[in-house]
Amino acid sequence: MPLRALLVGTLLLFAACAQPPPPQTDLLMPTEAQMKLRSLQTRTFEVADREAAIRGVISTLQDLGFIIERANAPLGLVTAARFAEPNFRDVIGVTVTVRPQADGKMLVRANAIYNNQPVEEPEVYQNFFAALERSLFVGREER
């Protein structure tokens, strides 16, 4: 029995001293799937005023039933969440960034998660951007 315990202890000691493999050099490189998802999540709008674009994002999210958690105009960042139907136990979270581009347009990226999993369905983003476009158009007409 003592010999067996000594062998097990020695094996554990050697296993504890083993070096983990070095991280891959492309660890932070985006995959093709991530690039495709990013293209679904991003749209350019003909709005020169960043504040107006952020107000449009907030209005759109509220119209879609989201509760705004944070809105940071200097960073162009809006986060929101809502409970998902039909059971209202699942949570949908959205983070939207608004960045100005050199040509006077705004680049809007929406990132949605459903129960801590990224939403990859194109229709979700198409519906959001269609609603945002309507909101921005109405906002422009009211001025």
Residue map of PLM features:
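Bacterial N-terminal signal peptides that target proteins for export
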Residues: 1-7
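C-terminal motif of bacterial Sec signal peptides marking the signal peptidase cleavage site
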Residues: 13-16
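Ser/Thr-rich, low-complexity intrinsically disordered terminal regions
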Residues: 18-143
